[in-house]
Amino acid sequence: MSSLVADIGALDLTRRRRGRPDDAFGALVRSVVGQQLSTKAARTIYERLAALFGDRVPPPAELLAADEEELRAAGLSGRKTEYLRDLAGKVESGDLDLYSLHSLTDEEVANRLVSVRGLGQWTADMFLMFHLDRPDVLPVGDLGIRRAVEKAYGLPEAPPPGELLSLAAPWKPHRTLACIYLWESLESDK
């Protein structure tokens, strides 16, 4: 990892926050929109969704009241529309208190988030890393991280999650930063 950090040098971490919502609901909406899409496609659909609501992320009640056909026309799949409505419904009903998440442990945050349809461990990890700014998150299910570790460590294939946990043990308590370097290494290869 040290040679990777030396090769890449200092990172502009503020660059990674550009375009990301400041509020928890907006961050989760953006995560759902971006699932299984390229960064460019995710950004386009997210911007179309925001445009439906006056160039902002709609509050939960507005998202629940939105016309499904308009949401689909913005580029959301039927499944993602369901996920966003489940998220909005849980926030609106108080079943998911987004304001309390900052005071919970990483595991508690993840458990709360994965109770929402369409939010899995990867989404919880991204939320912890980039919205709650938690310093020691390792998204073992992220294929980009696994591929970057494969390349950086000269492995014959991407390590499975358990092996990745072992390899990443020396990075504690800064695994989030290590992951940012790993993602950056993939970008610099392009």
Predicted regions and their residues:
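Mid-sequence acidic-hydrophobic segments that form the walls
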Residues: 52, 87-94, 112, 116, ...
